[in-house]
Amino acid sequence: MTLDPDFSKNDGLLPVIVQSADDDKVLMLAYMNELAWHRTLETGKAHYWSRSRRKLWQKGEESGNVQTIREILLDCDLDTILLKVVQTGGAACHDGYESCFYRRYADGKLEVVGKRVFDPKEVYKK
């Protein structure tokens, strides 16, 4: 039985669900390729593959909001990864929120329900 995710599926990109190790709150959804997987295992820090920039990146490399791995789970088909992490800085979202899922959809409207931890204009000065 293989112990690694099956990167032969989905053009080598697998979805990664990221949860807080403290309270199981869903923080974000990202993608990993085999390189990101191995870098994550080597460093103990979450690394992902950016589909838009087409490059490897470490979560928090610009913001300092690094994700330290506490536990890794794989689904039954070995094609989805669940990371339980300790989120440094309190924000997983590049918009400055604790979770990327900071908006609730109801009655055809979006309502901000998450807590903003930082101003992205201050953190990502480009």
UniProtKB/Swiss-Prot annotation:
Function comment: Catalyzes the hydrolysis of the adenine ring of phosphoribosyl-AMP.
Protein name stated in the entry: Phosphoribosyl-AMP cyclohydrolase
Gene Ontology CC terms: cytoplasm
PANTHER family: HISTIDINE BIOSYNTHESIS BIFUNCTIONAL PROTEIN, HISTIDINE BIOSYNTHESIS BIFUNCTIONAL PROTEIN HIS7
Family: Belongs to the PRA-CH family.
Pathway note: Amino-acid biosynthesis; L-histidine biosynthesis; L-histidine from 5-phospho-alpha-D-ribose 1-diphosphate: step 3/9
Subunit structure of this chain's protein: Homodimer.
Cell compartments where the protein resides: Cytoplasm
Domain of life (superkingdom): Bacteria
Organism whose genome encodes this protein: Syntrophobacter fumaroxidans (strain DSM 10017 / MPOB)
